[in-house]
Amino acid sequence: MKHLFMATLTLLLAVGTAQADPLFGVWKSAADDNGKFGHIEMQDCDGKICGTLIKSFAPSGKEASSPNVGKLIVWGMKPRGDGKYAGGKLWSPDRDKTYKSKLRLTGDNLQVSGCILIICRDGDTCTRVK
């Protein structure tokens, strides 16, 4: 009986810690300077949150090939509570720049901001695909 109790307790603790973060899923990025956008899959990467470009689209909305599909776009993000995430980096393929980044999740919208030194880029919004 004691073993059954311990096994049940262990299972319940494992389920509680394995719950998915609300940020996990697929997000449609804001259009870049050329009008292209992508789908980014946000997931757990060794206890932090990362995002990989899984599809790329032309300005027309038609799926397009891209050498960046499969590459990390977001990495090292940590939840800060109240829908806020920070401590990570974001790579902007159209500018080939990496920014210190912050995210704010509100429903199915994700506000993205990032800075290089004192220059900040703010206001891009991603929308949840699934």
Role assignments for model-derived ranges:
Residues 11-12:
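Repetitive helical segments and hydrophobic/amphipathic motifs
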Residues 7, 22, 57, 106-107:
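General secondary-structure edge motif
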Residues 15-20:
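Sec/Tat signal peptide C-region and signal peptidase I cleavage site
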Residues 23-24, 28-100, 127:
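Central antiparallel beta-sheet cores of small beta-barrel/beta-sandwich binding domains
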Residues 123-129:
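Short, low-complexity, Pro/Ser/Thr/Gly-rich segments in the mature regions of secreted, periplasmic
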Residues 94-95, 100-123:
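Short, exposed beta-strand-loop hairpins at the edges of beta-sheets
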Residues 2-8:
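Sec-dependent signal peptide recognition
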